[in-house]
């Protein structure tokens, strides 16, 4: 009898805490090649204002320093502000259109974003250019249970499929989560056909095009699309949290009415049920 009472008290003393609803989405934002987190944040000032009611962006800087540009003077030192998520050429550089190359440093970047994702408790992904390529890979890895990152949605601007050999099998199954794909009709760095090919790896991609080049647009003509996308994502996110809270509450009730007490508690347990 004493053993049963002790077990019951132990169960009730550490109930599963309810998850506090988040008022905004928390989105991990991945910059492009030769960018960094601070620079990307600065470039997205207008975009952040558009979505500020519904979402907060968490910017992270890639761990690898990109080498000097090919036309740099001899002896030029690498700029620590120019970063890369990985390198897909044997000379230690990156080019989105390169095919059948390596993915040097990819695992280091994967570990970094997994760490930040967990620390910041993010729920969605956003990426630009190489960062959007990375987002596409993360979505696929998540679907196959190969990363701790579990995005509810993704936003990919000027994205493309990775041409690295180790990533070629990442696009065999379509990604199921909601996605918004943004690209410029006049993009000469990542042609729109490459962004369209990445969008085709998702089951129901939402497409937003603009007449410009290689950038994430944030003009009045795009505002409504952004607002509606993130408002809908927030609604689904909050509904999921409510279900999670209800499930946790039901679990606590089941514990409180376990076999030791059959729903009747001793006086010694009153402090556990004060709330």
UniProtKB/Swiss-Prot annotation:
GO terms of biological process kind: response to retinoic acid
First and last residue of the signal peptide: none
Record EC number: 3.1.2.-
One GO term describing the cellular component: nucleus
Keywords carried by this UniProt record: Hydrolase
Bias-annotated ranges (Acidic residues): 266-275
UniProt region (Disordered), positions on chain: 1-21, 253-275
Gene Ontology MF annotations: hydrolase activity
Protein name (Swiss-Prot/TrEMBL): Esterase AAEL000016
